[in-house]
Amino acid sequence: MSDFYRSFRDEIAAGGAVDDGTTGSTPQGRAVGVVMLALLVLLAVRSPWTFVFVVGLLVSVFLHEVGHFWTARRTGMKATQFFMGFGPRVFSFRRGETEYGVRALPLGAFVRIIGMNNLDDVEPEDEPRAYRGKSYPRRLLVITAGSLMHMVIAFVLFFGVYVTAGGDHATGRAVVRGMLEGSPAWNAGIRSGNEIISVGGVEVGSYDSVVAAIGAHSPGDTVTVVFDDGTSRRRAEVTLSESTSRPGRAFLGVVADDTEEKRFGPVEATGRSIGDIGGTMADSVSGVFTVLNPLNSWRQLTDEDAPVENRPTTVVGMSQIGGEVGESRGLAGVLQLLAYVNVFVGMFNMFPLLPFDGGHAAIATYERLRSRPGRPYRADAGKMIPVATAVVGLLLILFVTGLYLDIVRPIG
């Protein structure tokens, strides 16, 4: 067995770098660290909102590991390493039994807990503090703490935005926000800021209801549109034209808005935050399977019309989106985007295969189901390494695909 594969196997199974007993830094780590720091400074100067988003991602990753570390310590497990980043050490120091530090590549973070499985050698005196020797509830708490922390982060961000900056609130009114000059609505005297009351005798209170009322007619039909121009209600006879983008469909020529920004109180903000998290979790479940599907990656590479919401992306693409959101919506928009990203990452991380946390949770659950009183069952992690290797290979393909698309066909 090669040294590279042995190291790869041990680190995949252990959930982090194998402790070699050294601290400090390496020349390679210092060099790469200086380059990374310079790039962050350059990013802060050239695109402040992108920098804010990237810092938010790094803080989220750090808090993910804090979740693992804190629960491990509270449940009596021994954590020997807590690192931000991967690759060569930039610097590290040891406090007590734990080495803390930063590594050169800011691609994630890890906490090293001893005895994650049967492949992890543990000193006899440390065996009572090994992960594998703890009860199933304690192991499950520690391994899911990272994803739970993402949900806490998302809630705090959603809640903070709703009570300070506010969010969209349904008004029950369809107010014109956009017009196409020369359209049937324009010719009838309807202008931006007017409120549409009814179309063809059907009362409307949202943009969707306006679309539905128009869709009930055919091109060439004349309908009565009642609207409020701010001073009085007016009635206009409008002859609908044909949509150029959807042949055969009637066209009025307005874009209406049925929401407005509103600050929410703590109770309503709590409800909306929980609802946003629940909805994003549901979307993330289907999204994970879509993103992990190699056929989806192939379609994204070969078809420029493939749905952009299904494409794999990297921190490069997400940072581009974060910068654009910051330019248009400011800090509140960036924080909301970070909240959605945290929910997705939390769900993605629970995919039940190594090297995800969900893989460790699945192993712990399998061991619990196979165990009998007085006869604890321990799974052979070595048999799972080929599957974990395939997952890592798939993730590498997704990363390369996402990075290529982020550079060649940036979102937005």
Tell me the role of every PLM-derived stretch:
Residues 74, 107-175, 386-390:
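Internal alpha-helical transmembrane segments
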Residues 30-76, 310-336, 412:
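Long, highly hydrophobic alpha-helical transmembrane signal-anchor segments
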Residues 185-208, 277:
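Conserved PDZ fold ligand-binding element
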Residues 2-16, 48-125, 341, 348-370:
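Small-residue-rich helix-interface/hinge motifs
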Residues 5-29, 129-130, 134, 244-345, ...:
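Functional transmembrane alpha-helices
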Residues 1-51, 400:
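Transmembrane alpha-helices
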